[in-house]
Every structure is written in C-alpha cells, then in structure tokens.
Amino acid sequence: MVLIKEFRIPLPLTVEEYKVAQLFMVATISKKNTSLGEGIEVIENKPYADGATTGFFTRKIFHLGGRLPTWLRSFAPTSLQIEEKAWNAYPYCKTSYACPLLGDRFSVSIETRYEPDSGTQDNCLNLNSEELSIREVEHIDIVNDPIDEAHYKPEEDPKIFQSVKTGRGKLQNDWMKSTKPIMCCYKVCKVEFRCWGVQNKVENFIQRVALRDTFFMGHRQIFCWIDQWFDMDMESLREFEKKTNEEMKAQFHNNNNNNSNNSNNNNNNNTQPQRSSFFSRSTDGNK
C-alpha cells in the first residue's frame, strides 16, 4: 500500500520570495552533496509547456552509493541510482523519483503547492476521498522542532539569526502567529516500495529521513540564507544555477576518476574501500 504523508511547512516569506529562495537552496545543497562524494548529475534543465501550463522541467540522476544506511546497503547495489524528474510550474510543482534497477517496485512522488497562509488549508492539493482516508498530516516548524545536535549550526538557527537586508529573524516560539509575511509549502508525498519483508521499513525511512528531515533542514537554511538570495532576480538566479551545474558536473567526473583510482589501489592491496553514509547521523539506530 502506498504511504501518503502531507507535510506543511510555514515560512516567514512571501510566496514570490520563496520562488527564488527554493531554487537557490536546491542548487547550493546539490553542489555541496556532490562535493561530498558520489554526487548529482543534472541531465536536463529547460522550459516546458503543457497546454496552458508553463514552467521548467529538470531531470537529475542521484548516485547514492555509500550514502545509504548500512541496513539498506545490505540488499541495494553499491552503484544505486535514483532518477528525479520535476515539473516546476510555480506555485505548483510535481516531482517523481524512480530507480531503473527496481522498476515499478519503487516509486516516490511529491506534489507541492505554495500558498500565502500558515498551513490552515485542509486539502490544498485536492486529494480524493481514498487518499484522504490514509493521508497523515505533519506540520514542520523550522523554529521549535528538535534538531540533531550533529546537524545544528548557530548561524542556521532561526531563533538566533537575524537578516541584515530584511530585518527578519530571531523568531520567537509563537512566530507563526506574530510574524508577517507568512506562507506555507504544502507537500503531499507518496512512497511505495514493494519488497517483501522490508517494505514498511524502507517506506518509513524514505518519509522520515529522505523527505521529512530534508525538508526541515532545507527550510531552516532557506530562511537563514535570506541575505544571500534576497537581491537575486530570476535572471541572476538562472546564471547561478548554470554555474553551479557546471561545477557539479566537473566535480562529479573528478569524483569518478578518484574513486576509480582508489578502487584500483584497494584491489592491489586486497583491502575494502571505506564509504561514508550520507544518512549515517540520522540512522545509527537502524543499522
């Protein structure tokens, strides 16, 4: 059965500001993750039109490898790849994830809508009655939700950070009631992994770690990086994306060359290469 969760993420931004903020955050974090190890390849990034709907289509390949937790690596290939396709027709976006090796046994889809409210709409993405009956709603609070100490940075704490350019920041516990502007990201995430014995564990891991924790950390960063993106228009942002994608491409190929050399050295020495896990800090209890 498909596991459906709806995440609602309020932010002290306008919907128009978030359009730039999100793209800046995705490009910045993608580059950082690629420099850490296996990496992300941007295959396509182009305008699209579907009837009256227009936006940008992107296709990426995530080379996960050692970023998987130990228990998941035990039955996943070391060269695991995930393909992402996204249709961004702001303020609506649809994203899908697939794994060629797993075929139709694995699927993740995310529908997102951005609205100028604090997360009060009950069915923003128009789920049908069957979907609503199994949907779980979770509110993500970038200020008050607990954070893993290993991931905490004072400069990315909305309670401490204050923007020089906007004056926003040092958000209080009741910030959703007292802060203007405010908006909400509504994200309906559907996860399915059909594999006997581990289905529930994998589906819950994806919803909790790969999605929920990523949304929480990423949206704290979106706000606390506001002075880096606030003055950007879409033209300068596209240039930033283009430059970042070129740097990621070069870094990815460098990583491949280094990994190939390390593999040869390890084979000669009869030793096993050491791999770091991207999720290791969050999944120690599941190993």
UniProtKB/Swiss-Prot annotation:
Protein name per Swiss-Prot or TrEMBL: Phosphatidylinositol transfer protein 5
Family annotation (PANTHER family): CYTOPLASMIC PHOSPHATIDYLINOSITOL TRANSFER PROTEIN 1, PHOSPHATIDYLINOSITOL TRANSFER PROTEIN
Classification via Pfam families: IP_trans
Ranges in a coiled coil: none
Superkingdom of the source species: Eukaryota
GO cellular component: cytoplasm
This protein's UniProt keywords: Lipid transport, Lipid-binding, Transport
Biased composition (Low complexity): 254-270
Region (Disordered): 252-287
InterPro entries for the chain: PI_transfer, PI_transfer_N, START-like_dom_sf
Tagged with keyword Ligase: no
GO molecular-function term, one example from the UniProt record: phosphatidylinositol binding
Biased composition (Polar residues): 271-287
Similarity comment text for this entry: Belongs to the PtdIns transfer protein family. PI transfer class IIA subfamily.
Gene3D superfamilies per UniProt: 3.30.530.20
Physiological role: Phosphatidylinositol transfer proteins mediate the monomeric transport of lipids by shielding a lipid from the aqueous environment and binding the lipid in a hydrophobic cavity.
Signal sequence bounds: none
Database matches in CDD domains: SRPBCC_PITP
